[in-house]
């Protein structure tokens, strides 16, 4: 590993991690300089590491297609103290598998995977990709932002035909979070890939021990790490000690507890990732001047750059394109973007010629509502047969559903004299709030899997700029007894492999979401018979009553849907029950048409039977009913590449009517092209009409 020295800030705890590496000198400077200089936002040293494409590589960390597809995750030589390289390997393994269906029947190794080339053919063997990585922090000088930036430059990069693809992390994942969603396509195309972790990055602080994560996933104490930790809780050591005494075995998380409202910066840090990639490419391919330093070969706008990713990363790409004032971004391709749109009067979302009940709500609104109602709505007749996605016994889950319905009814929040009617009313309220009937069978698994509770709690903390010591709405993050769910000390600290195995939003990697009741902290699902209704209702009230500054902080993350006439593609699954299409993509496209008018170059592809988590597609009931949206994300990237490089027109906005695999849950037939119709130039009756602030999606 080589490291390029930037700013002066460097933690003592990093010294051992840098052994075996070299520090290369570079100064910060302005864009008009003739010498390549690190952007001013880069803090500390840049680590440069070369990978041979055999023992280790950019895409698979040396695991290859076979290793990524194996259910046996890579281990550590010393489980108590894994190396940075081992943590990187586990992070790539975990994040790759978290974004796509990894089963052969589901498409891995046939439609996507390291062995599959950009034409969809199995020609690349194990798919290892040689090249170089550049790793650094972006910071504002406070040492508290510490956004992780990473650039991968494949050995196949052609300096005469340069390209960059952004791969901003989805969810609250670490810097490798979008390696399967966008990084893989970019590397295969021979492009540099610009990653960032959005200032969430799976950074955690173990309150009882003071242990924190560093940029490479290795650990240090908060005091020794100083300002070089991924995240350290802002409270004083005495305050944290008192909190730990009252609430032991708790964890602070960066996205939830940094008090930064990091989402407001997601567009900016994505642009920084691109600028950092420009610097890396100039460093690698620029002419040598004065014998040691490199000159400027590429200036803003010289490199074909596609802002890409999915979910939160997709929203970040859209925000970056809107904020781009220097020509960093050429085009945008995103999947299922989590985006909060600033809607203007007159903008309308229709389906089948009729206005939808609700659209354009921010995540803080729809997530807190869904978290409140989903456990009850899951008992509705329309949700019968939903895939079961919980480790709890079915009897426990059914009891939770019944009790949540009863408590909602007692509070006057749903109507009905029995569970069935109460559940139907809860589901009807979700319809009225903009959820589609296409999502009926996903309401249960979105809550049972704890995806929605995790989102509601983490984002409520972020949008209120809460501290870990606030225990917002009596929720916190803790290790628990696997049988009772009560807070308990872990047998082995989850911090050891957190960088490699965690996803940044508890419950993850043994750190669970707990509700702090009279008897102490317990897994929120088990803390009360109605699964911590009081906490869920409190989260909802934060939004409805505009408490703790939530409205102001949500306004700070809204976007205008002005892509500045850049060519763009949005892909979204119609059945998405985590990021409902009415509130995200449909609303964005409608607002974009009002903002940009006929100058807009945005195409929108809505995928029937597509939902948010392709990694769930191997679960019984998911396999038979839903199709991979990732397949269309890759098709969209190919379409955009052809548009940029050969002038091929982008297909117009359309509904893609897929065919579920069917069969027996857990044993669906192999995915085939019969399930996946192409995106077409002439969609006919499947065309989505977009004009002057109105989008009309065919039924």
UniProtKB/Swiss-Prot annotation:
<keyword id="KW-0732">Signal</keyword>
<comment type="similarity">
    <text>Belongs to the D-(-)-3-hydroxybutyrate oligomer hydrolase family.</text>
</comment>
<dbReference type="InterPro" id="IPR016582">
    <property type="entry name" value="OHBut_olig_hydro_put"/>
</dbReference>
<keyword id="KW-0964">Secreted</keyword>
<feature type="active site" description="Charge relay system">
    <location>
        <position position="311"/>
    </location>
</feature>
<dbReference type="GO" id="GO:0005615">
    <property type="term" value="C:extracellular space"/>
</dbReference>
<feature type="signal peptide">
    <location>
        <begin position="1"/>
        <end position="33"/>
    </location>
</feature>
<protein>
    <recommendedName>
        <fullName>D-(-)-3-hydroxybutyrate oligomer hydrolase</fullName>
        <ecNumber>3.1.1.22</ecNumber>
    </recommendedName>
</protein>
<dbReference type="Pfam" id="PF10605">
    <property type="entry name" value="3HBOH"/>
</dbReference>
<keyword id="KW-0378">Hydrolase</keyword>
<dbReference type="GO" id="GO:0047989">
    <property type="term" value="F:hydroxybutyrate-dimer hydrolase activity"/>
</dbReference>
<comment type="pathway">
    <text>Lipid metabolism; butanoate metabolism.</text>
</comment>
<dbReference type="GO" id="GO:0019605">
    <property type="term" value="P:butyrate metabolic process"/>
</dbReference>
<comment type="function">
    <text>Participates in the degradation of poly-3-hydroxybutyrate (PHB). It works downstream of poly(3-hydroxybutyrate) depolymerase, hydrolyzing D(-)-3-hydroxybutyrate oligomers of various length (3HB-oligomers) into 3HB-monomers.</text>
</comment>
<dbReference type="InterPro" id="IPR029058">
    <property type="entry name" value="AB_hydrolase_fold"/>
</dbReference>
């Amino acid at each position: 590993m080589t490291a390029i020295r930037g700013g002066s800030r460097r933690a003592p705890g990093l010294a051992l991690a840098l052994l075996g590496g070299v520090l290369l000198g570079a100064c910060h400077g302005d864009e008009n300089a003739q010498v390549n200089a690190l952007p001013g936002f880069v803090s500390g040293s840049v680590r440069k590491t070369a990978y041979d494409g055999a023992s280790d590589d950019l895409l698979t960390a040396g695991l290859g297609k076979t290793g990524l597809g194996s259910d046996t995750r890579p281990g550590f030589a010393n489980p108590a103290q894994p190396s940075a390289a081992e943590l990187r390997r586990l992070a790539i393994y975990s994040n790759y598998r978290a974004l796509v269906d990894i089963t052969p029947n589901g498409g891995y190794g046939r439609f996507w995977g390291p062995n599959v080339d950009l034409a969809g053919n199995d020609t690349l063997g194990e798919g290892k990709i040689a090249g170089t990585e550049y790793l650094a922090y972006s910071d504002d000088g406070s040492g508290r932002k510490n956004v992780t930036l990473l650039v991968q430059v494949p050995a196949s990069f052609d300096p005469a035909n340069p390209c960059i693809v952004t791969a901003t992390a989805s969810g609250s994942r670490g810097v490798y979070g979008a390696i399967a969603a966008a990084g893989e396509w970019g590397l295969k195309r021979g492009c540099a890939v610009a990653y960032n972790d959005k200032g969430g990055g799976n950074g955690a602080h173990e309150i009882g021990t003071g242990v924190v994560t560093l940029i490479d996933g290795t650990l240090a104490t908060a005091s020794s790490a100083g300002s070089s930790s991924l995240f350290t809780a802002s409270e004083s050591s005495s305050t944290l000690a008192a909190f730990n005494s009252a609430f032991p075995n708790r964890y602070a998380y960066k996205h939830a507890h940094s008090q930064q409202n990091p989402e407001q910066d997601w567009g900016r840090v994505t642009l920084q990732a691109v600028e950092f990639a420009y610097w890396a490419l100039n460093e690698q391919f620029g002419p040598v001047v004065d014998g040691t330093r490199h000159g400027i070969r590429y200036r803003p706008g010289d490199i074909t750059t596609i802002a890409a990713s999915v979910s939160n990363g997709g929203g970040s790409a859209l925000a970056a394109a809107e904020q781009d004032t220097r020509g960093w971004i050429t085009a945008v391709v995103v999947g299922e973007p989590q985006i909060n749109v600033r809607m203007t009067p007159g903008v309308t979302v229709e389906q089948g010629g009729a206005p939808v009940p609700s659209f354009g709500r921010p995540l803080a609104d729809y997530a807190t509502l869904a978290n409140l109602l989903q456990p009850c709505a899951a008992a509705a007749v329309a949700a019968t047969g939903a895939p079961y996605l919980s480790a709890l016994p079915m009897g426990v889950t059914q009891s939770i559903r019944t009790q949540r319905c009863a408590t909602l009814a007692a509070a006057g929040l749903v109507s009905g004299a029995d569970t069935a009617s109460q559940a139907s009313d809860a589901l009807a309220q979700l319809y009225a709030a903009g959820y589609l009937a296409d999502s009926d069978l996903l309401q249960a698994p979105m809550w049972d899997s704890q995806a929605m509770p995790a989102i509601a709690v983490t984002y409520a903390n972020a949008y209120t700029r809460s501290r870990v010591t606030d225990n917002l709405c009596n929720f916190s993050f803790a290790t628990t007894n696997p049988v009772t769910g009560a807070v308990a000390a872990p047998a082995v600290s989850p911090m050891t492999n957190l960088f490699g195995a965690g996803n940044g939003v508890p419950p993850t990697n043994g750190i669970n979401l707990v509700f702090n009741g009279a008897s102490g902290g317990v897994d929120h699902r088990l803390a009360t018979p109605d699964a911590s209704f009081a906490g869920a209702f409190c989260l909802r009230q934060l939004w409805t009553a505009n408490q703790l500054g939530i409205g102001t902080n949500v306004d700070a993350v809204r976007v205008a849907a002005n892509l500045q006439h850049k060519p763009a593609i949005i892909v979204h699954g119609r059945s998405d029950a985590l990021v409902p299409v009415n509130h995200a993509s449909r609303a964005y496209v409608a607002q974009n048409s009002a903002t940009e008018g006929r100058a807009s170059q945005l195409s929108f592809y809505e995928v029937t039977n597509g939902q948010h988590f392709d990694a769930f597609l191997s679960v019984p009931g998911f396999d038979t009913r839903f199709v991979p949206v990732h397949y269309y994300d890759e098709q969209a990237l190919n379409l955009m590449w052809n548009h940029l490089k050969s002038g091929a027109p982008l297909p117009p906005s359309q509904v893609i009517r897929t065919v579920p695999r069917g069969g027996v849950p857990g044993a669906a037939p192999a995915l085939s092209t019969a399930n996946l119709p192409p995106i077409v130039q002439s969609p006919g009756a499947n065309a989505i009409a977009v004009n002057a602030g109105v989008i009309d999606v065919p039924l």
